[in-house]
Amino acid sequence: MPWIQLKINTSGKVAEQLGDTMIESGAVSVTFQDTHDTPVFEPLPGETRLWGDTDAIALYDAETDMNAVIAMLEQEPLLGVGFKHKIEQLEDKDWEREWMDNFHPMQFGKRLWICPSWREIPDPSAVNVMLDPGLAFGTGTHPTTSLCLQWLDGLDLEGKTIIDFGCGSGILAIAALKLGAARAIGIDIDPQAIQASRDNAQRNGVSERLELYLPKDQPADLSADVVVANILAGPLRELAPLISDLPKAGGHLGLSGVLSTQADGVAEAYADKFTLDPVAEREEWCRITGQRHTS
C-alpha cells in the first residue's frame, strides 16, 4: 500500500519528543536521520544518541488527512504555526523484492565469495558461503566485515582452529571453515546472534565443526591459531587482556570494527604481545592484524 511521508528538521535534543507527538498525530512509524550524514558510534548502554541537526521522518497511511496532522503539530510548542516540513507520497513497491534485487554475490580476496541463496553462484569452483541478511550483523557489505573476510582469505587456514569473537551472523567463522579451518569457535553476547550463526552454519554444511558460546558459557582454556574480533574500538580496548590471550604463540590476530582515527589507541592495547602489521583501511574503517610473540 502507498504511504505518506512527513519530514521535519529539528535538533537532536528534542527529536524524540517530536517523534512522540508525530505518533500521537497518527504516524505508524517515526525514524530519525542525520541531516548531514554524520555517523554516530558507540553510544553508552541505554543511551539514544542523536545528531545535532536531525530529520524526524514519519509515515502515515495514504488516507490520512495531512492538513489535520499539520494543524495538530502546529500546536506543539517545539514547532509552532507555519513550521517547515516536507510531505511526499511514497510509491507502492514490492519492497522485499526490491531489497533482494539489490543484494548480489560478493568476492573477497582470491577464493572467497559470499552469495545470497536466491542468486546463482558466479564461480562454483570457488569457496562459496551462502548467507542471507538476517537478525545479526555480518553479510559482507560493511567495510569491516569485508576487511576481515579478505584477511581470512589470505591466510593458510588448513587444519587450523579459529575463534570468532563477537560472531554476529557467524560469517567469519563459517568462511574460515570453508577456507580449510578444522574447527571454529564463535562467541557473542547476543543469543540471537548465536542462533543466527547456528542456522547459517547448518545452511553451509559446517555446523559440526562450529562451537558457539555466550561469554558466560565459554570454556576457560580457549585458544586458537587464528582469532578475529570484528566488534568496536571501545570493547576491543577494554577486552584486550582477554582477547590477547586467545591466540596461541605464533598465532594470528585480526581486529576490526575500528575507525581509522581509533586505530592507534586499539593497536597500543595489543602491541606488547603482538608484532603488528601495517593498518589496512577501507573508507573510514580499518583492520589491525598481527602475530603473537613466541616468547
UniProtKB/Swiss-Prot annotation:
Which reaction equation describes what this protein catalyses?
A: L-lysyl-[protein] + 3 S-adenosyl-L-methionine = N(6),N(6),N(6)-trimethyl-L-lysyl-[protein] + 3 S-adenosyl-L-homocysteine + 3 H(+)
EC number from the UniProt entry: 2.1.1.-
Regions crossing the membrane? none
Q: Which Gene3D superfamilies match?
A: Vaccinia Virus protein VP39
Q: What are the binding positions for S-adenosyl-L-methionine in this chain?
A: 145, 166, 188, 230
- Location, primary (coarse class): cytoplasm
What family is it from?
Belongs to the methyltransferase superfamily. PrmA family.
According to UniProt, the name of this protein is Ribosomal protein L11 methyltransferase
